[in-house]
Amino acid sequence: MMSNGVFDAYQLPDESECPERLNSVNVSEDFSVRYPNFRALNKDALVKLLIENNVAIKSMPVSEIIQAIGRVSERLMDKDDPLRYEALDVMVPTAGISPQMAETILAGMSAGWTEKTLTELVEREFTNPKVLDSFQRIDSGRSQMVYGFTLNLTVGSGTVPGVGVTALIRALLLKSSILMKPGLGDVALPVLFARALGEENEVFRKCLAVFYWDGAKERIERKTLEKVGVVVAYGSDDSIRSIRD
């Protein structure tokens, strides 16, 4: 959501509570990003909720997940869609790029998120993509199923728009719930994409938590890290080291 030069850089599950206190960072003279106060956020409750809600997406056919993602991608490529307008408006100040560059990046990224592209991806990766949904016979004596982690924690840093959405999509294809911190320069697309997915299907409003926090000042506690299945990190060596340590 954006109003008067302020972008709310968070999308939390329906049942979670957003702290009343919000932090804000100015990314330009007339634009700021607002996000939940990290210390006030009940992270244990949020992680517990995402884990519990994972059953909803685990029962969703991967073809339906791909279709929903594809529809959002189409919206981002539709020059008359308000979602595209908002994405471009927020990308410019947050990533520090020109309007022309924002359009070029959005067009290139969105083309990789279409239903056709993602269907081809899973067909390349898996001989039978249905292994993402259930056990499939691979020979006369064996069956196989691909089972993603219950909760995926993705931590990003930097200013490359779209990286977070690609990571989010790959986790969704494995039917993981996702807790994501995008980099400040990449807050626009992951947050807006998560919101748009929630409009496509309520399942995504249960299993996605995408919000910014200042990774240099606030670190995820070890007890929280121990509850997630996998941690995916993008950024500098120092950024990744801060998570490991």
Regions found by a protein language model. Give the residues of each.
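N-terminal Rossmann-like NAD(P)+-binding subdomain of aldehyde/semialdehyde dehydrogenases
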Residues: M1-Q144
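Conserved active-site and cofactor/substrate-binding residues in soluble primary-metabolism enzymes
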Residues: M60, E64, A188, D238
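Residue-level signal for inorganic ion chemistry
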Residues: I65, K175, V231
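Alpha-helical scaffold segments in soluble metabolic enzymes
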Residues: R71, L192, A196, S242
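Conserved small-residue-rich beta-alpha loop and adjacent elements
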Residues: L118-E200
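Conserved NAD(P)+-binding/catalytic subdomain of aldehyde/semialdehyde dehydrogenases
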Residues: N201-D245
